[in-house]
Amino acid sequence: MEKYMFLFLGGDPSHLSPEKQQAHMQKWFDWVEKMKNEKRYVAGEALMPGGKTVTGPKKVVTDGPYAESKEVVGGFFVILAKDIDEATKLAKDCPDYDLNGIVEVREVVKFE
């Protein structure tokens, strides 16, 4: 099995009612539990909105990324899958698609 990273972009549930937000989070908990039971889940975290960016040779620091952007990374998982196709299939179970979320699937490089 190889390691793959899911980068979660968009999919902001903040406009939902508290009850719908809770139901949405339960879908996430269920998805993580399913992957843990299948021995696929390695790690994952949600990220706070905002932050800082450091850019270029002069290491210019600016505010951002901005939470209003549709392509801000909101979190990540590292999972195990046999190949990119299987990882992509697993990513299709992400609960954020109902909120127009995006999941970027990337293989983790092995340095040996």
Regions found by a protein language model. Give the residues of each.
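Conserved, structured core segments of small domains
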Residues: 1-112
